[in-house]
């Protein structure tokens, strides 16, 4: 028997799938949106940009922008009670519209 691999994108077949109407690149407004330090964002992984995508466990998490590194944003979020720092580009972020 062959040993199963447990790579970085393991178990993401349905999670990172795009529906037919969503295929292709995202809109420009998502890429050009400027986040400021302190803004809340939702981590929404875009499967067309592989190299800057966060791990699948952060899909749908809400975090706070704590810094900027070049084009990328430093996001602080929690996994349970642990504070985690994620560095990712705006392709994988959406502004949080909910309460404070």
From Swiss-Prot:
Gene3D superfamilies: Ribosomal protein L21
Molecular function terms, GO-annotated: structural constituent of ribosome
Transmembrane segment boundaries: none
GO biological process: translation
GO cellular component: cytosolic large ribosomal subunit
UniProt entry keywords in alphabetical sequence: Ribonucleoprotein, Ribosomal protein
Superkingdom of the source species: Archaea
Annotated family: Belongs to the eukaryotic ribosomal protein eL21 family.
Matching NCBIfam families: PRK04306.1
Record-given protein name: Large ribosomal subunit protein eL21
Taxon lineage: Archaea, Thermoproteota, Thermoprotei, Thermoproteales, Thermoproteaceae
Gene name per UniProt: rpl21e
């Amino acid at each position: 028997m062959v040993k199963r691999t447990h790579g970085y994108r393991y178990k993401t077949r349905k999670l990172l799938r795009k529906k037919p109407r969503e295929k292709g690149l995202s809109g420009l407004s998502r890429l050009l949106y400027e986040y400021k330090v302190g803004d809340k964002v939702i981590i929404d992984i875009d499967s067309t940009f592989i190299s800057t995508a966060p791990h699948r466990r952060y899909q749908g998490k809400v975090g706070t922008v704590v810094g900027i590194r070049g084009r990328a944003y430093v996001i602080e979020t929690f996994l349970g009670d642990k504070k985690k720092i994620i560095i990712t580009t705006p392709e994988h972020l959406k502004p949080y519209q909910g309460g404070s």
